[in-house]
Amino acid sequence: MTGDRELWRVASDSGTVVCWMITCCEGAELQLIDGERIVLRELYPMKTDLYERARTLEAEYRERSRESG
């Protein structure tokens, strides 16, 4: 069974970045999508590690959004 889940979304003047978790039986993939483009793909055997990385990235992107806005 597979599943996709949007974890967060950050909008700024330059566009919107969306973080997705794509799951399958081998683990989970974290994807950052900026507009139509995948800008980051990372594989994790454990969802807990993926969630931790997603929180770190969200904080970074929210900070960038505040600085540019």
Where are these regions (language model features)?
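Short, surface-exposed linear segments at secondary-structure transitions and domain or protein termini
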Residues: E26-Q31, T48-L57
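A short, exposed loop/beta-hairpin motif centered on an aromatic-Gly-Thr core
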Residues: E36-D49
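Short aromatic-glycine-(Arg/Gly/Cys) micro-motifs in beta-strand/loop hairpins
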Residues: T16-V39
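The feature represents the first ordered module of a protein
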Residues: M1-V17
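Acidic-residue sensor for enzyme active/binding pockets
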Residues: E6, E29, E42, E58
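Short arginine-rich
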Residues: R55-S68
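Edge beta-strands of extracellular beta-sandwich domains
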Residues: E42, S68-G69
